[in-house]
Amino acid sequence: MTYVLIPGAGGDPRYWDLLVDELHARGHKAVAVPLPAADPDAALPEYADAVRAVVDTHPEVVLVAQSLGAFTAPLVAAHPAVRLLVLLNPMIPAPGETPGDWWTATGHAEARAAYAAAQGRDPHAGVDLAVDFFHDVPADVAARLIDGPQESDAVFVHPNPLRRWPDVPTRVISGRDDRFFPADFQRRLAVDRLGVHPHELPGGHLLALSQPRLLAETLLNLTG
């Protein structure tokens, strides 16, 4: 079994480096896919092509998708090699929904503001990478990745070709300390859109950086 890892916004495969090391140490194959996120002409079909090219080279695959990667993963999950789809702190799409429409459709802004207020943080503050994403990531790791590649607008505005969720077992893993996609918000979305309850781990939005060992163990438990 090979774990094929789809990054979130920015398409940076380095996000998965620590998890890849943990999976390799346990005797498992893992491949992180670079996405053409900076290409202004690349959107979900091109992202799916990049992932599919990797999946094509492995007989049995677990697809693992971080955040925005949850829009790409279901476009590839019908591939005959895919045995399981795992979504990590995901933007779970509805069929045909674009990533740009997802924010309003899911009530994300309200959920994020409510969680910030409950924690004593400013509910009206703009997105801050250090506060919202890297707050629980070791400083040396954050220093390497916080200024990673940017995402072009194309993926947010171009059509989403997904017409139905693929007939592949799907699991959701969420960080119970995620400040960007709060755990309550993720629970609601996973149940409403997939009919599944997330496996919750301690940690924020970037679990592969803050909890790589625990995440590796969780993935292995999910895949038997």
Where are the model-predicted features located?
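Flexible "cap/lid" loop of the alpha/beta hydrolase fold
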Residues: 78-119, 153-160, 182
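Active-site loop/oxyanion-hole signature of alpha/beta-hydrolase fold enzymes
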Residues: 29-62, 100-108
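Gly/Ala-rich beta-loop-alpha elbow adjacent to hydrolase catalytic centers
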Residues: 64-69, 73
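Glycine-rich His-Gly loop
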Residues: 6-9, 67, 90, 175
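Conserved serine/cysteine hydrolase catalytic core
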Residues: 151-213, 217
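Conserved alpha/beta-hydrolase catalytic His-Asp/Glu region
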Residues: 119-164
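Short beta-to-alpha linker loops that shape the active-site pocket of alpha/beta-hydrolase fold enzymes
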Residues: 34-38, 91, 204
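Conserved HGGG/HGGXW glycine-rich cap/lid loop of the alpha/beta-hydrolase fold
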Residues: 1-40
